[in-house]
Curated annotation (Swiss-Prot):
The gene is cofE. Catalyzes the GTP-dependent successive addition of two or more gamma-linked L-glutamates to the L-lactyl phosphodiester of 7,8-didemethyl-8-hydroxy-5-deazariboflavin (F420-0) to form coenzyme F420-0-glutamyl-glutamate (F420-2) or polyglutamated F420 derivatives. GO terms for biological process: F420-0 metabolic process. This is Coenzyme F420:L-glutamate ligase. It comes from Methanococcus maripaludis (strain DSM 14266 / JCM 13030 / NBRC 101832 / S2 / LL). Pathway: Cofactor biosynthesis; coenzyme F420 biosynthesis. The lineage of its organism: Archaea, Methanobacteriati, Methanobacteriota, Methanomada group, Methanococci. A divalent metal cation 2 binds at residues 156, 213.
């Protein structure tokens, strides 16, 4: 007998194109939608970077000798390579036409998360502090609406040993980031010993499927009735420490 247990709603929202010259905050914009308690609001990092004016014009960049040399190997403009280097702690892997770095946030990804997509001009790094951005947006929404919500800032990144990019959570506020389920029992009463769920990543990927990664124009997703604890989670707790990384 099949029994319905969970019914989650995913709502993709179109918003005005963000230029960076807005006279309103993201919290104010999002609060114009009829939110409900325990909605999880997932926002594309592009929107956050643009409204925070975290876009760099190419004529403001002076490429270093290292950037000039790398640009030849990577087939990228020296200005873009310079921003990639500026946003990184270290180069993890370098090859023909690709560069994998550890960003200043601790993410290991291609190009330090830097790109020019969905930006009319300039080069767009990731938000400087995604957890702080998520926190400020959440607090603003809760102040305006009186609703208790969670906020996730997501980005699409490639995955080792898997093809295709997938949405991940880079900033989290108001919901659990890493859900530690150790000590709970499985269906047969056995105690879980190692289970940790990257629940914020799972929600980020769910939202990313609706957002799309081309010209869909849906940078905001509301996830309603999500089976997630509403705790003080962060995106940082999803980052594996270097000393725990068996591949580096």
């Amino acid at each position: 007998m099949i029994k319905e247990r969970v019914k989650m709603e995913v709502i993709g929202l179109e918003i005005p194109l963000i230029s960076g010259n807005e006279d309103y905050t993201l919290a104010e914009l999002i609060s114009t939608y009829p939110l409900e308690d325990k909605d999880v609001i997932v926002i594309a990092e592009t929107v956050v970077s643009k409204i925070e004016k975290n876009v760099i014009l190419k004529n403001e960049i002076t490429p270093s000798n290292e950037a000039m040399e790398l640009s030849k190997k990577l087939g990228k403009e020296p200005e873009v390579v310079q921003v990639i280097l500026d946003e990184s702690n270290e180069i993890v892997k370098l090859g023909p036409n690709f560069i994998i770095t550890e960003t200043k946030h601790g993410f290991v990804c291609a190009n330090s998360g830097v790109d020019e997509s969905n930006t009319s001009k300039g080069i767009k790094p990731l938000p400087k502090n995604p957890d702080k951005s998520a926190e400020e947006i959440r607090m603003g929404i809760e102040k305006i609406t009186g609703k208790k919500v969670g906020v996730i800032i997501n980005d699409s990144m490639g995955r080792p040993f898997r093809k295709g990019s997938c949405g991940i959570a880079i900033g989290v506020s108001g919901v659990c980031g890493l859900w530690d389920r150790k000590g709970e029992k499985d269906l047969f009463g056995r105690e879980l010993k190692t289970t940790e769920v990257g629940i914020a990543d799972e929600l980020a990927a769910t939202a990313s499927a609706v957002m799309g990664q081309s010209n869909e124009g849906i940078p905001l997703v509301i996830i309603r009735n999500a089976p997630v604890p509403f705790t003080n989670g962060t995106g940082k707790e999803l980052i594996r420490k270097k000393e725990e990384d068996v591949f580096r």
